[in-house]
A protein has these predicted regions:
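Active-site-proximal beta-strand elements of phosphoester/diester hydrolases
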Residues: 3-6, 21-24, 107-113, 129-135, ...
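Metallo-beta-lactamase
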Residues: 70-130, 242-247
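A general structural motif
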Residues: 18, 42-44, 70-72, 127, ...
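Binuclear metal-ion centers of metallo-dependent hydrolases, dominated by the metallo-beta-lactamase
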Residues: 5-10, 74, 86-102, 176-179, ...
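Short acidic loop-to-beta-strand element that houses the catalytic metal-binding Asp/Glu
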Residues: 11-15, 119-122
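Active-site neighborhood of phospho(di)ester-bond hydrolases with catalytic His/Asp-centered motifs
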Residues: 22-26, 43-59, 75-80, 131-135, ...
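Active-site environment of divalent metal-dependent phosphoester hydrolases
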Residues: 28-30, 53-57, 81-85, 100-102, ...
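Pre-active-site segment of Zn-dependent metallo-hydrolases
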Residues: 13-52, 59-67, 136-181
């Protein structure tokens, strides 16, 4: 049994027969976390944070352990959170960077790369392989449509100079590294963020072109609306991939 519940933005709670996984918690408008954990108090809870950005990590997650004497929590965090001094070393059970692995008797975790901050996650649990992208995405896709995409430009929005072609190569390079580990996921959670502009589905499309995916779950669309995430559905249908509609 796998039960996936959307929390908010890039946050999800995944419950299996043996445990509960919580990814990139930011806020919980519907009270998902406490409701699900209270229903399954005997199951161990694994809490993941892929990087330090405030929409993927909040110190509130540490209060769950303090407030619950019945549940067993394991905190698995990206090392950039420690480097940015957003958390103390002793507050997490496991600190991970790209290429590191960790496992116990229930799950195996591999930290894969990101072309933004921190890591993405491969989690093997109860015979299933799960992928959470964190902030791994083709964020500069709209600039690839310009007359000179292979040229450094300045974005006031991002406040930096960048080369769209170089940035896309970084993203595709991370996908290549992930394929060295596995080319198949039962469940994939990936950014489909309309704020990127034209081509905002490109990163997710490039991913499903390279991997076997049992189900695609969009995320990181809070500011652009549920409808923007649905734009991925036709691309998934073309490939026979189930699409998880949120909203």
């Amino acid at each position: 049994m796998i039960r996936l519940t959307y929390i908010f933005h890039s946050g999800f709670l995944l419950e299996t027969d043996s445990c509960i996984l919580i990814f990139d918690y930011w806020m919980d408008p519907s009270g998902v976390v406490h409701r699900c954990i209270n229903r399954s108090k005997i199951k161990p809870v694994y809490v993941f944070a892929s990087h330090f950005h405030e929409d993927h990590f909040t110190r509130e997650i540490f209060t769950w352990k303090e407030d619950s004497l019945e549940s067993n929590y394991t905190y698995i965090l990206s090392k950039d959170i420690l480097k940015r001094r957003r958390a103390k070393k002793e507050e997490a059970d496991v600190w991970m960077a790209k290429g590191s692995t960790w496992e116990d008797e229930l799950i195996k975790v591999t930290a894969t790369g990101s072309n933004d901050s921190g890591v993405s996650w491969i989690v093997e649990v109860d015979g299933k392989c799960i992928f959470h992208a964190g902030d791994l995405c083709n964020w500069y896709a709209r600039f690839l449509e310009g007359p000179n995409p292979d040229q450094e430009i300045y974005s006031e929005e991002f406040g930096e100079h960048f080369n769209p072609v170089t940035e896309e190569k970084r993203f595709l390079g991370e996908l290549k590294d992930i394929r060295k580990i596995t080319d198949s996921f039962d469940l994939m959670m990936f950014p489909v963020d309309g704020r990127i502009g034209n081509g905002y589905t490109l990163g997710a499309r490039q991913f499903i072109d390279r991997f076997k995916v049992g189900m695609l779950v969009p995320m990181h669309f809070t500011m652009s609306g549920f409808e923007s995430a649905w734009r991925m559905q036709p691309f998934c249908q073309e490939k026979g991939i189930p699409f998880w509609c949120i909203g």
